[in-house]
Amino acid sequence: VRMGTLSDLLSLAHERAQNLGLPYQGALTPAESWQVLQLAPGAKLVDVRTRAELDWVGRVPGAVELEWKSYPSMQENPNFLAQLKHQVDPEALVLFMCRSGARSDSAARLAGASGYANCYNVLEGFEGDRDASNQRNRVGGWRHAGLPWYQG
């Protein structure tokens, strides 16, 4: 993956978000997200997957782990915003990631509407979409892209 400049990556992400009609700053592929994290020292990756997913599927080194929903009930975390504000500066560039990009989209929308001006969604998420055999980790996603992760 060719390393773009931070401003190139962020303007591409912003253009993508506008094309998709997203209310937050931008949408990045996993590879672009990793580049942004390398180029912007204050940037934070917020992994909103459940504890179970982190423990059983894998974690990203250095990510802020903050459940959007809890397993097994999948109830929304009522303290999400308070926990986010406690752990991540509202001025920071914040990248939200989940399994496939759906919960992280919701988290980015909430954060963006709550004073976080630089919210980005990691498209494809950690595991990517299901393939023709209904399995993940083969089409897109952080892990499939060969980016750093470790077993929970």
Q: Where does each model-flagged region fall?
A:
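Rhodanese-like catalytic fold shared by cysteine-dependent sulfurtransferases
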Residues: R2-A43, R51-L93, S104-G152
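Short, surface-exposed ligand- or partner-binding patches at beta-edge/loop junctions that are enriched
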Residues: F96-M97
